[in-house]
């Protein structure tokens, strides 16, 4: 396997958190490598298709490879041994009549319970926290669930579109984001991990690029701007 990698390193264990240099996903052709140093969890924001989910998968896969075959696709990788849990790519379950939201909260509770057992240090990866419910309850519940993960010393990597969480949880998590570039009415993604919370939005701009009516675009932009300024939706 090592001979199939363009570059790899032998992991170093004994350090709490994670220090990775030029970490990349081994299954992606011409991958963009990223470096990160963390002593507490990461809250990851960014627009659609900017690279959030891929980064979570990269770290999760690297941790598993480090602990199993002592090989990591990176220049250097320092961490500790963790029980790795994920809450990603979930689906509703018709066989058990479980809605998407029910599957989500069961998945997250299993991670919290693992941390409370204190059998092993836990590292977890959560993609789009509680996206299966309404905005108000999603932000309220996500805040408390992510706080609980941190309080139970679970080393968490969580991706979200809810920028509000970056302020509510800034004492418990490090904020990182991915950006997009829009030039000549085309969007591109550099896939470079950046520190801090995301400040840009691209959903309405994508509607414009796909030819939606300009009047519709302007009304949507005004609604978004009004909400940001006033904290409530206009009719």
Q: How would you label these PLM feature ranges?
A:
Residues 1-6:
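Transmembrane helical bundles of ABC transporter permease domains
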Residues 7, 11-235:
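ATPase nucleotide-binding head domains, primarily ABC-like/P-loop NTPase cores
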């Amino acid at each position: 396997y090592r001979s199939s990698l363009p570059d790899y390193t032998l992991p170093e264990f004994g350090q709490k958190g994670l220090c990775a240099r030029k970490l990349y996903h081994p299954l992606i052709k011409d991958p963009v490598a990223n470096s990160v140093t963390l002593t507490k969890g990461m809250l990851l924001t960014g627009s659609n298709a900017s690279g959030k989910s891929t980064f979570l998968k990269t770290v999760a896969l690297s941790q598993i490879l480090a602990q199993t075959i002592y090989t990591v696709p990176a220049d250097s990788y320092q961490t500790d041994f963790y029980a790795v849990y994920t809450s990603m790519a979930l689906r509703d379950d018709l066989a058990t009549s479980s809605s998407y939201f029910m599957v989500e909260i069961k998945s997250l509770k299993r991670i919290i319970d693992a941390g409370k057992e204190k059998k092993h240090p836990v590292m977890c990866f959560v993609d789009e926290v509680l996206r299966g419910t309404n905005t108000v309850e999603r932000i309220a519940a996500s805040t408390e669930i992510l706080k609980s993960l941190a309080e139970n010393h679970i080393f968490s990597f969580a991706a979200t579109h809810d920028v509000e969480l970056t302020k509510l949880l800034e004492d418990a998590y490090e904020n990182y984001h991915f950006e997009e570039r829009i030039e000549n009415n085309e969007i591109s993604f550099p896939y470079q991990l950046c520190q801090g919370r995301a400040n840009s939005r691209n959903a309405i701009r994508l509607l414009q690029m796909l030819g939606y009516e300009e009047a519709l675009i302007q009304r949507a932009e005004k609604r978004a701007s009004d909400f940001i300024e006033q904290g409530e939706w206009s009719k």
